[in-house]
Amino acid sequence: MSIDLEKLFLHEKAVNILIKIYEYEKAGKKAYPLSISRDVGSPYSYISKVLGIFERAAIIESKFEGRVKRVKLTEDGKEIAEQFLRIKNLLNRDFLARKKLRIIEAALTNGNDPNRLLPIKAELENLKTNDEEVIKRVEELKKKVGEMLNGSP
């Protein structure tokens, strides 16, 4: 069974289905196959197939509420979804901006000569990203460079 799950989780849609169920539960909402289908953008038949595999693997449990099937994560399913979210967040980082930031930080440790600090300040101004961690660090470094240029410790 684990080999089937490995293959399944190499598909983006399967991961998105699992994460969508997790997000519903985190928001205090109930997860239904039809709403998952709409949110993930996959046909209901595919969602149903994947949910069947998840249920056989004890990643989700399902029960009928009237004529409507509701799904929820098991403890193992929740753990898997959290791991995938961590991986997804890691992969959404701006690695190029982080590399540039490390280079700038290394250059900044070489003293506070204004001839060296002004290009660093310019690089910090030009570093654009959506990566929140990088944005925060850039702001900290801008402040530090400004203080160094103004003669503050």
In which residue ranges do the predicted regions lie?
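Short helix-to-turn junction characteristic of helix-turn-helix DNA-binding domains
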Residues: 21-25
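Basic, amphipathic "hinge/linker" alpha-helix immediately C-terminal to the N-terminal HTH DNA-binding motif
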Residues: 66-84
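A short, conserved structural fragment
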Residues: 55-65
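Short acidic, hydrophobic short linear motifs in intrinsically disordered regions
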Residues: 27-38
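Short amphipathic alpha-helical interaction segments
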Residues: 41-56
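Short alpha-helical segments that sit at the start of domains
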Residues: 1-20
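Non-catalytic, well-ordered alpha-helical scaffold segments
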Residues: 12-15, 48, 78, 139
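Amphipathic alpha-helical dimerization/coiled-coil segments
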Residues: 84-151
